[in-house]
Regions:
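Metal- or metallocofactor-binding catalytic centers and their adjacent structured scaffolds
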Residues: 1-55
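Short, well-ordered coil loops that connect the C-terminus of an alpha-helix to the N-terminus
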Residues: 9, 57, 65, 153-154, ...
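N-terminal amphipathic alpha-helix/helix-capping segment at the start of soluble metabolic enzymes
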Residues: 22, 53, 57-71
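Short, well-structured alpha-helical patches and their helix-loop capping segments
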Residues: 35, 39-40, 65, 87-94
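Short alpha-helical segments and helix-capping/turn motifs at coil-helix boundaries
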Residues: 46, 58-59, 93-98
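Beta-hairpin (beta-strand-turn-beta-strand) motif
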Residues: 48, 65, 76-78
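Active-site phosphate/pyrophosphate- and oxyanion-stabilizing loops and adjacent acidic/basic residues
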Residues: 49, 61, 146
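Metal-dependent enolase-superfamily TIM-barrel catalytic cores that perform enediolate-based chemistry
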Residues: 70, 75-194
Length: 195
């Protein structure tokens, strides 16, 4: 609501100007974090949709036009399950099996958070993912990675940390990503930790 008042009644065709207004005029915009930027993004997407409809062009044309005939997709957040097989994963075998399941649907890349649940599918507290992580935590993550590699071969793996790790633990898990040739490491720290 605080941000929407900055664009209501304005010309929706002036998308860049309105984005700058939301970012700079709002008390919350600059350095506002993921909630504020999600709100700005939602409004910006709506404005681009309006602009595309007025000009009778798809939004991708507004953003520079078509570049690729197809875009690669990955199966995301597999620690929660896949398709009708929904629920947290705990064991290394469960991580590997759910990745195989996604690959059977045609995916050749997967994204998982290895830090959310322990082997018994219980939530891992954030504090246990920060600093010098325990040997057990580190081994659990590596066991899951090894199981996926053994079951799925050269599937591209993205490690998603949801900002739950800090610099120290993020680097440690990043070393595992290097060791097992990961495709990417996503959000190893929160946006508020620029180091």
């Amino acid at each position: 609501q605080d941000i929407s008042r900055l664009v209501i009644g304005k010309d929706p065709m002036r998308t860049d100007e309105l984005w700058e207004r939301m970012f700079k005029v709002s008390f919350w915009g600059q350095g506002g974090g993921p909630v504020v930027f999600a709100a700005i993004s939602a409004i910006d997407i709506a404005l681009m949709d309006i602009k595309g409809k007025v000009l009778n062009v798809p939004v991708y044309e507004l953003l520079g036009g078509k570049v690729n005939d197809s875009i690669r997709c990955y199966a995301s957040q597999l620690q929660f399950g896949w398709n009708e097989d929904v629920g947290p994963r705990g064991t290394a075998k469960e991580y590997a099996d759910i990745c195989k399941y996604a690959m059977e649907d045609g995916y050749d890349a997967v994204k998982l958070d290895f830090t959310l649940y322990d082997r018994d599918k219980k939530d891992i507290p954030n504090r246990d993912c920060e600093g010098f992580v325990s040997t057990d935590f580190y081994n659990m993550v590596e066991e899951r990675i090894v199981a996926i590699r053994e079951a799925c071969g050269n599937v591209d793996i993205i490690m998603e940390n949801h900002g739950r790790t800090d610099v120290t633990s993020g680097i440690k898990l990043g070393e595992l990503c290097d060791k097992y040739n990961f495709y990417a490491l996503e959000e190893p720290c929160t946006p508020l930790r620029p180091e």
